[in-house]
């Protein structure tokens, strides 16, 4: 039955290999790009007076020079500067769009002179991405009487938008309506936009405040990896909705919008926006107002839109109304987003893609975050996390290793039963079960620690892949990005030879592995040497190859994950050795290593 126990462990390990190979070899297919081109529509009121008007406007100005550089596009309109400790950019006075934003704390690569990350870009530049606010015309109101994408706003207060220094814009339609927009920003990534309209005419008007996030085409840096959500994310009445980029054009055509769209009506305390790997933009309407959240795709213009529209308001002569909306545009930092959730943004922490194992990924990241804050190094934080996980699982591991030690003690009796049963496998199995029952041994107990490690491994992989705190997180020496594969390579003797190794992620990098995968293979191999090699030749060969197969297979994974696996193997080795010795079984590690290198002689036939 010892062979059966090894078969159980082997089956689990091979299943694990299949799952990991699937991650590497079978990412989701690339989506087809939709047709491109520009079109122009305008704000049109809903047929029902007093209901939410449709927002079907072209978010771009009527005159756009496509394909120009970002710097050239920024020069097409007067601007108000945005400057804080964490972001820089500008607001276009043409349309009042927030369309120029970069994140000072993040660079595109780890090079010291690398460009900082660009979050929002103006119309006309590659990958235009911006936020637009305004008032949708209600029943009886001419759309030309409300501000649109071609509206030229005037600055009436504030030269530079910064923390505690808002900017106020104004536009008068010349027909008795004056529109004012106050834009504020905090010390992180949250804008607050307060829109108001004053009616000095002789007749009441009905308008509805809206906010639009527009992206021209899909992002160029899509990961297209099924463990990561990229696309639209929305929260409506406590329910999170995620829509992938390639699913948005497949929406049914909305009769009022005339384009593929999906609406969520009468939402309280909701939000909607676009999420990327590490960055996100989200519209957050007044939580006390009943809002409509819309995801929309304009196929001819190839523009994706996320919209919020608040209920229409009637502005009587001589009065004014206002509405406040927030805009988050920045990095998906756990602590920053958690603070916004504490301030009232419902379930904002779930904008980070925690995955199916959220009940594991959330606490794992929580521990990593605070271990890193305490230690000051994410690599050592991963090792500390491994120690904590192994300590939590120690009671189960103890029972497993005790059972394995007892199995070793029963080996002579098991061999005797095999000899007595001969070819009668049923008799042998019955005898084995009686022996296990008598000695109170569970032959499958050795599988339990391995089974428990599988969801933990996947959860940590998810955390390392999706959280920005692991992006460019250094360990030591050459390991300056724990979210990237090991940059070292045996090709240049790990930096001793005067040339670079293969590009990380390439086929050559999988062959000429780095230091960390090598240590992983060695740690797995040593862990096996706690027990004698299986007597079955097939099992013996599979067990002999397994550490080195894992070594090459995991060589292309994030180095932080490999650090976890090395630490896990090392701690498991120590735990198993000490527990088995405490039960009277003394693992002969050096003897098993020596035996593994000895040439096996074929037994004499009888």
From Swiss-Prot:
Segments spanning the bilayer are 8-28, 116-136, 348-368, 374-394, 448-468, 506-526, 542-562
Q: Which GO terms describe its cellular component?
A: plasma membrane
Q: Where is this region: Disordered?
A: 33-59
Chief location bin: membrane
Short name of one Pfam family: YidC_periplas
Under Gene3D superfamilies, the record lists: 2.70.98.90
- Look up and give the membrane topology term: Multi-pass membrane protein
Q: Give a yes or no for keyword Endoplasmic reticulum in this entry.
A: no
Q: Where in the cell is it found?
A: Cell inner membrane
The UniProt keyword set, sorted, is: Cell inner membrane, Cell membrane, Chaperone, Membrane, Protein transport, Transmembrane, Transmembrane helix, Transport
InterPro entries, A to Z: Membr_insert_YidC, Membr_insert_YidC_N, YidC/ALB3/OXA1/COX18, YidC/Oxa/ALB_C, YidC_ALB_C, YidC_periplasmic_sf
GO MF terms, alphabetically ordered: membrane insertase activity
For biological process, the GO terms are:
protein insertion into membrane; protein transport
Q: Does the keyword GTP-binding apply?
A: no
Q: What does this protein do?
A: Required for the insertion and/or proper folding and/or complex formation of integral membrane proteins into the membrane. Involved in integration of membrane proteins that insert both dependently and independently of the Sec translocase complex, as well as at least some lipoproteins. Aids folding of multispanning membrane proteins.
* Assembly information from the UniProt record: Interacts with the Sec translocase complex via SecD. Specifically interacts with transmembrane segments of nascent integral membrane proteins during membrane integration.
Q: Which family does it belong to?
A: Belongs to the OXA1/ALB3/YidC family. Type 1 subfamily.
Q: What is the name listed in the Swiss-Prot or TrEMBL entry for this protein?
A: Membrane protein insertase YidC
